[in-house]
């Protein structure tokens, strides 16, 4: 089945389509996408992930067409800058 894996930084957004087995989990799709190699700062032990904006565990089974999203942590400095604008 084909699913998407998305990751965004302030300067770049990546959305890859990957072909995974019908029994694949969100972790499987992320690993197969190559994003962990492309963006070594991704740490799945601390960063949250979701499917279509809904937080989920890495072991969540996927369905055809799902979009797995890797979320970046929000830093307090970013929140302060936003409030000052």
From Swiss-Prot:
PANTHER family according to UniProt: UPF0125 PROTEIN RATB (PTHR37483:SF1)
Tree of life domain: Bacteria
Organism, as annotated: Rhodobacter capsulatus
A Pfam cross-reference name: Ub-RnfH
Name by which UniProt lists this protein: Protein RnfH
Disulfide pattern: none
InterPro entries, sorted: Mopterin_synth/thiamin_S_b, RnfH, RnfH_sf
Family to which this protein belongs: Belongs to the UPF0125 (RnfH) family.
Gene: rnfH
């Amino acid at each position: 089945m084909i699913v998407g894996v998305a990751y965004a930084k302030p300067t770049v957004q990546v959305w890859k389509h990957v072909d995974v087995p019908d029994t694949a989990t969100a972790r499987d799709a992320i690993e197969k996408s190559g994003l962990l190699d492309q963006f070594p700062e991704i740490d799945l032990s601390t960063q949250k992930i979701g499917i279509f904006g809904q937080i989920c565990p890495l072991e969540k089974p996927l369905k055809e067409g799902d979009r797995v999203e890797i979320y970046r942590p929000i830093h307090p400095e970013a929140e302060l800058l936003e409030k000052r604008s």
